[in-house]
């Protein structure tokens, strides 16, 4: 299996399966001298880990990360950073009934067709369990971005089913189990999720993430456009079915006179483009939104086929998130941080010392 690595100069490679002994990863390209501890990485891992509220899967994992290499006396050495998280709460017996059945909406059928075999226990390599390592690696990137460049990456749940946030207060996001930035929507979210769990069904969601204080100039103008690589990163998250940068699909109904972000000596008058023009960051906030499908692992009976191509009934057992979008918030933050970290290093490698004759303008007037 290829495709286990992400990034060019700041590279993350992950390994492991949902019900294996452990999951792990290697981070290459981190500059030396960054102060980092396991506790630093644990903050976002605790936000992502399962079993923390009634609204997510009942599987309980501590998700305690171990730094195996690349850090000495509390600082990065510039060598490969090894990360490991042990799996503790697997219940592989819950999946015995799907050994020869293909769960609809999952990777069971495609893995079987591509590899001729599959790890049916919790989805194996296709499980979102793997994203815990992305979050740990993203924690390294987030710390570097903030401490060295003042860049902050902030994610939140912007919609869950029919419940949409009306305002964004980042100080509220991490005070509730939904990562919702609108305090007035918490009761509606709670009521909706309680009813959903009783029905045994699941629901989709929209997650948003913004990067603040990003400098102008990150990204390459052709194949490695900053927005293209952000979309690549977000589409690589389990269950993501669509990504928008800035106004996204709303631009269909916009006129050019409305959509263009006017430049003034004081700064940009708007940010419809989401902080990227021509594949290069403008210095404005980078705004990203993604749609996540409802999980297909539900207790509502359905139809599928088995390995003998016979139509059969299926009810998925196991412990699953009724809305995968909730725990996707720290994952989205991590992936955006990894993209920005990679492009900062690439920009530094090629463009150090480059000066434009035009003075940079503010991100927002």
From Swiss-Prot:
UniProt remark on cofactor binding: Reduced FMN (FMNH(2)).
Keyword Transmembrane among UniProt keywords: no
Top-level taxon: Bacteria
CDD domains: Chorismate_synthase (cd07304)
PROSITE patterns tied to this protein: CHORISMATE_SYNTHASE_1, CHORISMATE_SYNTHASE_3
Key words, A-Z: Amino-acid biosynthesis, Aromatic amino acid biosynthesis, FAD, Flavoprotein, FMN, Lyase, NADP
GO aspect biological process, one term: aromatic amino acid family biosynthetic process
Named cofactor requirement(s): FMNH2
Enzyme nomenclature, EC number: 4.2.3.5
Gene3D superfamilies reported in the protein's UniProt record: Chorismate synthase AroC
Catalytic activity: 5-O-(1-carboxyvinyl)-3-phosphoshikimate = chorismate + phosphate
One function term, GO molecular function aspect: FMN binding
Coiled coil ranges: none
Pathway terms, separated by semicolons: Metabolic intermediate biosynthesis; chorismate biosynthesis; chorismate from D-erythrose 4-phosphate and phosphoenolpyruvate: step 7/7
UniProt xrefs under InterPro entries: Chorismate_synth (IPR000453), Chorismate_synth_AroC_sf (IPR035904), Chorismate_synthase_CS (IPR020541)
GO cellular component terms attached to this protein's record: cytosol
Enzyme class: lyase
Residues that coordinate or bind FMN: 125-127, 238-239, 278, 293-297, 319
Binding partners and assembly: Homotetramer.
Function: This reaction introduces a second double bond into the aromatic ring system.
Descriptive protein name: Chorismate synthase
Species assigned in the record: Alteromonas mediterranea (strain DSM 17117 / CIP 110805 / LMG 28347 / Deep ecotype)
Lineage, uppermost ranks: Bacteria, Pseudomonadati, Pseudomonadota, Gammaproteobacteria, Alteromonadales
């Amino acid at each position: 299996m290829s495709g286990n690595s992400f990034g060019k100069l700041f590279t993350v490679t992950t390994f492991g399966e949902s019900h294996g002994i452990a999951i792990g990863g290697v981070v290459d390209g981190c500059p030396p001298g960054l102060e980092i501890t396991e506790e630093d990485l644990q903050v976002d891992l605790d936000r992502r880990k399962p079993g923390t509220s009634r609204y997510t899967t009942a599987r309980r994992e501590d998700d305690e990360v171990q730094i195996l290499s690349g850090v000495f006396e509390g600082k990065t050495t510039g060598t490969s950073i090894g990360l490991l998280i042990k799996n503790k709460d697997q219940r592989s017996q819950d999946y015995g009934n799907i050994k020869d059945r293909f769960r609809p909406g999952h990777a069971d059928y495609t893995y079987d067709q591509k590899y001729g075999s599959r790890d049916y226990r919790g989805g194996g390599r296709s499980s979102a369990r793997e994203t815990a390592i992305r979050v740990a690696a993203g924690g390294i990137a987030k710390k570097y971005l903030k401490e060295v460049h003042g860049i902050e990456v902030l994610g939140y749940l912007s919609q869950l089913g029919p419940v949409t946030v009306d305002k964004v207060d980042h100080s509220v996001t991490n005070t509730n189990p939904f990562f919702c930035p609108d305090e007035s929507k918490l009761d509606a979210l709670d009521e909706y999720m309680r009813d959903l769990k009783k029905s045994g069904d699941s629901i989709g969601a929209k997650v948003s993430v913004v990067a603040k204080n990003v400098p102008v100039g990150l990204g390459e103008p052709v194949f490695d456009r900053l927005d293209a690589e952000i979309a690549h990163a977000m589409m690589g998250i389990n269950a993501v079915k669509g990504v928008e940068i800035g106004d996204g699909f709303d631009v269909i109904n916009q006129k050019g006179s409305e959509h263009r972000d006017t430049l003034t000596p004081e700064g940009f008058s708007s940010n419809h483009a989401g902080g990227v023009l021509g594949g290069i960051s403008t210095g404005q906030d980078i705004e990203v939104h993604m749609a996540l499908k409802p999980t297909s692992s539900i207790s509502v009976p359905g139809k599928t086929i088995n390995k003998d191509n016979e139509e059969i009934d299926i009810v998925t057992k196991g412990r699953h998130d009724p809305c995968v979008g909730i725990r996707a918030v720290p994952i989205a933050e991590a992936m955006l941080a990894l993209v920005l970290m990679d492009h900062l290093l690439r920009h530094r490698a090629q463009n150090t010392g480059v000066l434009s004759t035009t003075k940079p303008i503010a991100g927002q007037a």
